Amino acid sequence: MTREPHRLSRRTLLKQGMGIFGLLAGGLMSSSSLAEILKEPTPRQSLGPFFPDEGDPIDAIRENHAIGLPISQANDQDLTYVKGRRGKAKGQVIYLKGKVLSAKTGKAIPHTVIIMWSASASGRYNHKKDDGMLKFPHPTTGEIIHRTYDAYFQYWGRAVSNEQGDYWFKTIVPGFYPIDLEAGQYRPSHLHFQLFPPEHPKLVTQLYFRGDQIPNNELNQKLLPMDVVILDAGLTTIDLERVIVDYAPDASGEILDGLVGHYDFLAPN
């Protein structure tokens, strides 16, 4: 069933300061419509060509050498360094925190395996297929950007939600990169995810960035509505809003080495 583009997600309502009860009281939305919105799963998007399957990475980073464990699940959830290497990943550090919930019931889903992967801060993947356009001019400033491999960036990681459905990752903001310079097409900064919620279908999606301290934030916001992956997935304006995460300094003051974003995955039924 095609989603209606005028529908508002819970996250959008809260961001606009409208409030759920205000919508109900003001007659802008029926209780049945609200219930339907709160049950919409996280929008699906493509896996992409750079998932870390065995034999694909340029550098086969494997922190966990357990027999039978796929390389995509062999690294921890802190991607800002590689165990055994003296150095830190380049780029703006971020923390992504949230829960894995059932879209149908709203209940937490523990023991969900979450695989996350992305490009480096300069927009280069640890993947043999990512071998083109290794330098390009910034579309706004004209500065030449070199898409370089970062030996201190982990590139992919694995988290498992706890009994309350909580998960977290620590990583860097990946760079945007060109997919067709002549057509002026670029992929905005994004994180890839593959989730395996117990007793639920697998979820594959991507999350995007927004925030005053996010590198190339203004450019990323311009690129998002015309992104080929978003368009191919058939995301509406509201769907897109649901997969953009706002990042800012930690309001509690506990996290001092990076920006913090929050996102709850809603697993399909």
Where are these regions (language model features)?
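Compositionally biased, intrinsically disordered low-complexity segments enriched
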Residues: 8, 18, 194-196
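Beta-strand-dominated extracellular/periplasmic modules and repeats
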Residues: 34-244, 256, 260-268
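N-terminal secretory signal peptides
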Residues: 1-12, 21-22, 26-27
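Short amphipathic beta-strand and strand-loop transition segments with alternating hydrophobic
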Residues: 245-253
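Hydrophobic/aromatic-lined pockets within catalytic cores
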Residues: 18, 22, 105
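Peripheral, solvent-exposed domain-edge segments
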Residues: 16, 250-251, 268
